[in-house]
Amino acid sequence: MRLLWGLIWASSFFTLSLQKPRLLLFSPSVVHLGVPLSVGVQLQDVPRGQVVKGSVFLRNPSRNNVPCSPKVDFTLSSERDFALLSLQVPLKDAKSCGLHQLLRGPEVQLVAHSPWLKDSLSRTTNIQGINLLFSSRRGHLFLQTDQPIYNPGQRVRYRVFALDQKMRPSTDTITVMVENSHGLRVRKKEVYMPSSIFQDDFVIPDISEPGTWKISARFSDGLESNSSTQFEVKKYVLPNFEVKITPGKPYILTVPGHLDEMQLDIQARYIYGKPVQGVAYVRFGLLDEDGKKTFFRGLESQTKLVNGQSHISLSKAEFQDALEKLNMGITDLQGLRLYVAAAIIESPGGEMEEAELTSWYFVSSPFSLDLSKTKRHLVPGAPFLLQALVREMSGSPASGIPVKVSATVSSPGSVPEVQDIQQNTDGSGQVSIPIIIPQTISELQLSVSAGSPHPAIARLTVAAPPSGGPGFLSIERPDSRPPRVGDTLNLNLRAVGSGATFSHYYYMILSRGQIVFMNREPKRTLTSVSVFVDHHLAPSFYFVAFYYHGDHPVANSLRVDVQAGACEGKLELSVDGAKQYRNGESVKLHLETDSLALVALGALDTALYAAGSKSHKPLNMGKVFEAMNSYDLGCGPGGGDSALQVFQAAGLAFSDGDQWTLSRKRLSCPKEKTTRKKRNVNFQKAINEKLGQYASPTAKRCCQDGVTRLPMMRSCEQRAARVQQPDCREPFLSCCQFAESLRKKSRDKGQAGLQRALEILQEEDLIDEDDIPVRSFFPENWLWRVETVDRFQILTLWLPDSLTTWEIHGLSLSKTKGLCVATPVQLRVFREFHLHLRLPMSVRRFEQLELRPVLYNYLDKNLTVSVHVSPVEGLCLAGGGGLAQQVLVPAGSARPVAFSVVPTAAAAVSLKVVARGSFEFPVGDAVSKVLQIEKEGAIHREELVYELNPLDHRGRTLEIPGNSDPNMIPDGDFNSYVRVTASDPLDTLGSEGALSPGGVASLLRLPRGCGEQTMIYLAPTLAASRYLDKTEQWSTLPPETKDHAVDLIQKGYMRIQQFRKADGSYAAWLSRDSSTWLTAFVLKVLSLAQEQVGGSPEKLQETSNWLLSQQQADGSFQDPCPVLDRSMQGGLVGNDETVALTAFVTIALHHGLAVFQDEGAEPLKQRVEASISKANSFLGEKASAGLLGAHAAAITAYALTLTKAPVDLLGVAHNNLMAMAQETGDNLYWGSVTGSQSNAVSPTPAPRNPSDPMPQAPALWIETTAYALLHLLLHEGKAEMADQASAWLTRQGSFQGGFRSTQDTVIALDALSAYWIASHTTEERGLNVTLSSTGRNGFKSHALQLNNRQIRGLEEELQFSLGSKINVKVGGNSKGTLKVLRTYNVLDMKNTTCQDLQIEVTVKGHVEYTMEANEDYEDYEYDELPAKDDPDAPLQPVTPLQLFEGRRNRRRREAPKVVEEQESRVHYTVCIWRNGKVGLSGMAIADVTLLSGFHALRADLEKLTSLSDRYVSHFETEGPHVLLYFDSVPTSRECVGFEAVQEVPVGLVQPASATLYDYYNPERRCSVFYGAPSKSRLLATLCSAEVCQCAEGKCPRQRRALERGLQDEDGYRMKFACYYPRVEYGFQVKVLREDSRAAFRLFETKITQVLHFTKDVKAAANQMRNFLVRASCRLRLEPGKEYLIMGLDGATYDLEGHPQYLLDSNSWIEEMPSERLCRSTRQRAACAQLNDFLQEYGTQGCQV
C-alpha cells in the first residue's frame, strides 16, 4: 500500500512538473477613481524553490510611458504562491496620465511587471496586463429631504451624507444639483463637507408645475459618483383623516369555471388615530395595463362607517352582470385590475377624503414563482440545485406551499429521464431542490409549479456545457438558507470529470466590487471551505473557486445573499411616557449609539404619506444596502460554461498570459429582454368610443377639453372659435357637441338623486384629474437638526400644536461604524376633548361674522362644556366677551357652537376661543387664530417725489400740500410716510432696495406669474451686486447682504427655468410657444449671472442657437409668439417694432458671447458674431432713414454702441437720438415723439420750479431714457448729458424703489447702476433736512443729518397725519431725494381713469343657512345619508349633486368644506373691454378682491386657463385677491366666470373692489366697486341683539321731533352742543338725496341755517354739504325733510373743497317739526323750546 501511494505521488509530481509555469492576474473588472483596487497575483505550476519578484501598477493603454498609479511590489514563491495587493488611481495621477480625456471606452490597464516573465517563460516582454473599465464613481452619497411632498412655494430642506467605499465618513468636496419636474437643472452648488454631513435648503418657485423634482449629489472630482433622491411637488393640503381600502384577498382568482367573491374592508381614521364616523360611497371599475380606467355601472354602494370601518361584498352574480354590460367575460380579465374608489364624508364637519385601490389583480394563480436564484449553468455529474421563491400576490413570502418539480434530463442516445420531486416552501417562501445530473447530460428541462389547485407555473431550460473540456468544479452548499452577519457559511468543493490532478483549490471572495479575501485549500476527496460572514460581505458576495487542469483553468462561482439585518453600528430612538401625548407637551427622546456619532434628526407629520405618492419614501437601511450592493460587479447567480465566463460573471478580470477576460463595457449588467402582452379590451362606453376616434395624443387632449364643462355658459361653437391650433379645433368642437347631446339626453330622461350624481361622477372621470387635495394649517415637519451623541443622550422636545401622528427619523454617522438608519419612532398627539375653528382670510369693519367652533368629545362620558370668546379690543362680542355658552357634548360625538362677532377696528386681531369642562371633568382646549380686519372701501396709493438741492436757493424750502381726497373714508386715521435719502445709489440698490429681503419683486406692487415678470427676481439684483462690487461698498451694508444677494439670484434662476423649453428657448407661460423677445431677455440676464448661479454654459449656448434661427435674411429678428401683443414692448408702431426687437436681441447675443469659452463652441460663437454684424447692418440702415421713434432710436443707439458697430452707423444713431431729447432745467429725458403710439400720453416735463414735485412719467419714457443713458455712458462716459438723464431717472423711482413695471424697472436700474459706478466718489457730503407739520396730535418736527455714505434715512419715524401740510427746510452740500407715500381707502371709484379700460363684476347666488345654531351631531350619525343596507332608507337619500360636488371640487385641489347646506356659494362674472381708439401696451390684469370670507374655486379658474379654448392666460390667488391675466383687452365686452365659496358665514357684506390695468403702464387702469347680490343672506344681519347693540354703539341716534322724554330736561340741546361732547358745527339742513358709497351712505343736503362752525368758515345758507353714515347703522334721513345736525368736524373734503361730516355717536340729528305740528296745543311748548335754542345758539353760541 505504501508503495502504491508513493507511485501516485510521484506520478502527480511528474504531471505537475510538466505543466507550464504562469503568473495569474486577478482584479475587479472596474477601477474606481481614488478608491483602492484589490489585485490578486498568483504563481501557477512553478518549480519548487522558485522565487518571482515584480510589481503591479495601472496605466493608460494609449500612453504606456505614464503610470496612473504608484507601483506596488510583490514577491511570490512556490511555497507562498499568491498575494492580495492594493492599487489606487489618485486624482492627480488620473489627470497626468490622461484618463480624464478618455471620453470613449474609458479603460485603464492593470500591468504586472517582472523580469521573470521574459527570462523564465520566454515571453517577448516582461509585461503582462489586462484592461479594466475606468470609472470616476466612488464612495457613497445618501440624500434626505425633510418631506416626501411639497407645495409650490414651500421651502425644501435636505441633507447629504458622504461616505467612502468602506462606508466610513468622507470629508470631501461635493457638487449638489437640483432638477425640476421637466428635468432642467435649476440649482448647482459646490461645497466642502468637513463633517461629512451637508445641510441646505431652497424654495420651490410658486409657479412650478406638479411633478417629481430631483436633488442629486456627486463627489466633485467623480462625475459618475452620482446619487439622488426625489420628491413630489403638487398643490395639496394635509388630510384630516386617512382612508384605507383593504381587500379580503390580495388577488381575485379568475380561471375557467371559477371566480372569487370580492370582499373588502374600508377603514377611515383621523391622523391622530381615532375612528371616523360617517358614510362611505364606493365605486368599482377596471384598470388595464396602461392605467386606463372604466367604471362599472350599477355596482355603486353607499354604507355607514361603524367605528371607522365598513365591509363591502361584491357577489359573483353582480360582477358578471356588470361585465356583460361591457361585452366582456371572465376570460378577458387576465392581467387587468379591479379598481375601487371610496369617498368618505365624515359626519361632524362634512369633510371628505378619498382613497383608491389600484393593485387588486385578476390572476390565474394566487402565487408568483421566482427562479432568478437558480443557476443557468450546470456541472455534469454534480447535483443541480433548483432554488425557487414563492410569494403571495401581496408580495409577502408564501410558506408551507407545495412546489412540484418535473425535471427532464436528456442525454445523447438515451431516452429522456424524468424526475418528479415535491417539497414545501420554508418560512421565507423558499425551496432548494437538488436534481441528480448524469455526466452525459446534454440538456435539463424544468417545469415548476407552486400551489394547488391553481398553481403558478414557471419553466426553465439549462443546456450542458460543451464537451471535451478540462473538467468541472462543483460548489455545493449544504445549507441553502441565506446566512446572517456573524454566521459561518460552509461550502464543499469537488472536481468532476477528466481525472484532474492538482494540489490546491484557490478561491476568492468578492463583495461590493472588491476582492476582500483570497486563499487556497488543499485538495481532498471532499474539500470544505468555511467563510465567516462579517459586515464587509453584506448585503451579498460572490465565492469564486478554481484550479488548473493542464493549461486550462477550471472555475465555478456562487452568489450568496446575506440576510438584510441591522447596520454595522447602532442607533436606537425611543421615547419615555405614554403611547399618546398632548399638543404642547414635552417629550424626552432617547438617542443610543455604540460609538461617538453625529445623529441627524427629523420629524414629519405622517399625513404627508397620505397626501403624496407612495413611491417617495424616507431613507431606510434597505436603500442603504441597495446602494452598497450597487458596487457589486457580478451578474446573475454564478457559474458559467468556461472559466473565463465564470470570472466575468462574478465581476473579475483575469489573465494568465495565454488567455484573459474581455474588458468590461459598462458598469451595469446586461438587462434581460422582456416583452409585455398588450390587451385591447372592447369597452362599450360612449365617451371612450368618441376619444378612441382620435389617434394622436394632441387630438385626444383637444377632445377631452371639449368634453369638459366650463363654469360659465358658452356654446360649443363659441368655445371652438377660441382654440388657436387649427388641428385642435375640429376634435374639440366635435367632442363638445357630442358631450352636450349626451347631457341633453340625460336631462330629458329626468334623472334625479344619486343616479344623476353618479352620471356626472363618471363624466368627470374622463378628465385628467389631479390628486385629491386635503387640508392643513399646521407645521408639517420639525426637529430638523444634527446632534453629537457619545453612546447616549436625552433630548427634551416640545410637541407642536397639531393633533396628528408624528414620525421621528434618525440617521447616525460614525467614524468607526459608518452609517446607520434607525427604526422611526411614532408619537401620537391627541386630545380626547378639543375644538376646531375656522376663520375667513379677512373681513371688513362692521361686517358681521358668525364663528362656529366645533367641539369634539372622544371620552366615554357626556361633557357639559363652557365655551366663550375671550374679550379683545376691536370686536363686539356677546356680553363684551367672556360670556360663556353651556353646551352638552355627548360621549363620542361633536357639536358646533355659534357666536356672532362684529369687528369695529381695522387691525390684525388675535381671536381666542376657550372651552372648559365642569369641576367633575376638568377638560379644556383653547384655539387662538388671527382675524385680519380691513378698513372699508378700496386702497388708494399716491406718491410724490422731490429733489433736495440745498445748492439751489429756490429749493431750500419746500411745502408739501396736505390736500385729502374727497373720496377718502371719513374716519380712516391715515398717514403720509416720508422717506429721505442722501445716497440714491445705496437707497435704490442697497439692503432697503434691490437687495431687500424680497428683492425688487417686493418693491413693485405687481403680480409676478409669467416668464418676463419672473426676471424681476434676477435682473435688478445683478445690477445691485455689480454696483456694490465695483464700488467696494458691501461693507456699508449689513454683513449678510452679499449672501442674501446670491440667494436672490439663485432663486430667480430656479424660477425662470420653469419657463425653459427643451430647445433652449423660453415662453411667457408654460403652455405657450417660445418668444424671441423673452428668450433674448433671459439670455442677457443669465449670461451676466453665470458666476452666481453656476448654470451650464451649454444650456445658454442652446439659447443663443435658438435665437439665431429667428433671424431673417435682412438681419432683423422675428417673434413668432410675442410675449405680449404690445407692438414690441413699448407701444411702438410700424417699423419701430422690428427695429426694437432686433436691437434687443443683438444686445442679448452680445452678452451671451461670454458663455462661449470652450473650444468646442467656437463654430457657434463665430455664427453668433456674424449674426450680430448682420443685425447691426439692419439697425444702421433703419437709423439712417431717420424715421424711428424715441424708444427704437434709444435701444438702437445702445445696441450699436455696445457691439462696437462701424463709426458711421454709430454717428447717425447718436445724432438721431439726441435730436429727440427733451431738456428742462437740469433734467434730460426722452418722451413721446413722432413715430410712437405713446403720443396719447400727455407730455410730462420735469418740474418747472425746484420746490415742485417731480411729475411721474409713464413706463415707456423711463425705459427709453434708460436706454439713452446706457448709450451715453458708452459713447461719452460720465458727461453732462449723462448727469442730466440720470437725475431725471432717479426722481422717477417709487417710494419702494422700483419704477412702473417690470421692463422699465430692469432697464432703469441697469442704467443707473452703470452711471453710479462711473460717477462713484469717496468724497463725503452732508444733507440736513428738517420736516415739520401740525396734525391731529399737535406739532411734530424731525431733524435729519444725512450723508452720501449712509444706507438710508430714518423713514420709520417720518409719519405725518394725512391732510396736514409738511414744511421742509434743506441745508448742506449734498443732493438728496424726498419721497412721500400716501395710502388711504376711498369710498368710490368715480374718479378713476375708466375712459380707456372698463371692468364690470357681478355676483349672483345667495346663501341659505339651514343649520340652526344649536344643532349637534349625536354620535357622529349622518341621518341625511342612510346606509345601503337600511331597509327603511328612501331610494334616493342624497341631494342630487351633494356627493359629486364635494368630490369634484376636492379633485381640483379645493380645501375641504362642509356639505352643501352649510356652504355659501356665489357665481362671479368678470367682464372687460376697452375703448377701440386706445391701444394697450400689452398684457392686462384684472385684480378682483373677493367679498369677505370667500375664496374662489380653483377648479373653475383652472378650466379658464388649461383647456384648449383658453380664456385667461394665467391666474393667481393671493389672500382675498384673484388675479386674472389677459393677453389683450378686446374692444367688445368679454366675460369670464367662476364660483366662489364662503366657508364662514359673514353678514352685512360690504362692497369690494376690482381693478383692470395695463401691466406695462399701470397708471392706465379702471377700478370699480361691486356688491353682494340683492336680497341675499350676505346682506342679512347675523348678530345677536346684544352684539348688534355693541356694533351700533358708534352709530348716530336720531332724535325724533319733540321727544317727550327730552322735553322735561332743561337745555338738553345746549348741554350736548356746549358741554358734552361740545360740537364743532351746527346746521339746519334740508336733505336733497341719498347715495351709496362703498360701506357708507352719503346724504347730500342744502344748508338752511348756520348755527355754528369751526373749520367750515365758508358755511352759509343755500350751500351744499355732504353727511356720511355707515351703511351698517340704522339711520336714514328722508329726502325733502329738514334736520338739525350738530357734531364734530370731519377729516375729509368734497370735490368743492368743503368739509364732509361723519355722523356717529357724537352727532345730534333731529328732524325739524312741521309748522302744522307746532300749531298743535300738545307740541306748542316744545316747538317754542326748539326755536329758542336755534335763536340763542345761532346768535350767541356757547357761553362757556
UniProtKB/Swiss-Prot annotation:
Record's disease association: Complement component 4A deficiency: A rare defect of the complement classical pathway associated with the development of autoimmune disorders, mainly systemic lupus with or without associated glomerulonephritis.
Tissue expression profile of the protein: Complement component C4 is expressed at highest levels in the liver, at moderate levels in the adrenal cortex, adrenal medulla, thyroid gland, and the kidney, and at lowest levels in the heart, ovary, small intestine, thymus, pancreas and spleen. The extra-hepatic sites of expression may be important for the local protection and inflammatory response.
Encoding gene (name): C4A
Residues marked Cleavage (site): 756-757
Protein name: Complement C4-A
Domain Anaphylatoxin-like: 702-736
GO CC field: axon; blood microparticle; dendrite; endoplasmic reticulum lumen; extracellular exosome; extracellular region; extracellular space; neuronal cell body
Lineage top rank: taxon: Eukaryota
Post-translational modification: Prior to secretion, the single-chain precursor is enzymatically cleaved by plasminogen (PLG) to yield non-identical chains alpha, beta and gamma. During activation of the complement systems, the alpha chain is cleaved into C4a and C4b by different proteases depending on the complement pathway: C4b stays linked to the beta and gamma chains, while C4a is released in the plasma. The alpha chain is cleaved by C1S to generate C4a and C4b following activation by the classical complement system. N- and O-glycosylated. O-glycosylated with a core 1 or possibly core 8 glycan.
Record text on subunit structure and interactions: Complement circulates in blood as a disulfide-linked trimer of an alpha, beta and gamma chain.
